[in-house]
Amino acid sequence: MALNKAEILDAIAGMTVLELSELIKEMEEKFGVSAAAAAVAVAAPAAGGAAAAAEEQTEFTVVLVEAGANKVSVIKAVRELTGLGLKEAKDLVDGAPKPVKEALPKADAEAAKKKLEEAGAKVEVK
């Protein structure tokens, strides 16, 4: 006979803190998960702005600051990175400083920066 959610919750409610701790450890072992991430997520809102400022940035924006001397190579690099057409890529390069790509993981942002710098552009990752 399977237990329903209400019965499981009632059983958990009747446990002591020590029993709950042991239950969590056994669940972590059985399912190969960690309850630490949930504890951090719950504690973060209570800590307020200090915790938010301490968090590592996960999304980055690649900003074209200046096209440099070799504008044609920069336009080609922008087209490869963004998939834009020739006119759109040229307008983006001419309108610098402008974001080229947004919400990228750090590795992708660094790769895009490297590609644009190799083409002769000045680039920032924010």
Curated annotation (Swiss-Prot):
Domain of life: Bacteria
Aminoacyl-tRNA synthetase listed as a keyword: no
GO cellular component: cytosolic large ribosomal subunit
Sequence intervals crossing the membrane: none
Coiled-coil regions listed: none
Pfam family, any one: Ribosomal_L12
Ribonucleoprotein among keywords: yes
UniProt record, GO biological process: translation
Swiss-Prot/TrEMBL keywords: Ribonucleoprotein, Ribosomal protein
Gene Ontology molecular function, alphabetical: mRNA binding; structural constituent of ribosome
PANTHER family: 39S RIBOSOMAL PROTEIN L12, LARGE RIBOSOMAL SUBUNIT PROTEIN BL12M
Function, as annotated: Forms part of the ribosomal stalk which helps the ribosome interact with GTP-bound translation factors. Is thus essential for accurate translation.
HAMAP family xref list: Ribosomal_bL12 (MF_00368)
Subunit description: Homodimer. Part of the ribosomal stalk of the 50S ribosomal subunit. Forms a multimeric L10(L12)X complex, where L10 forms an elongated spine to which 2 to 4 L12 dimers bind in a sequential fashion. Binds GTP-bound translation factors.
Family: Belongs to the bacterial ribosomal protein bL12 family.
The protein's name: Large ribosomal subunit protein bL12
Source organism (scientific name): Bordetella avium (strain 197N)
Gene encoding the protein: rplL
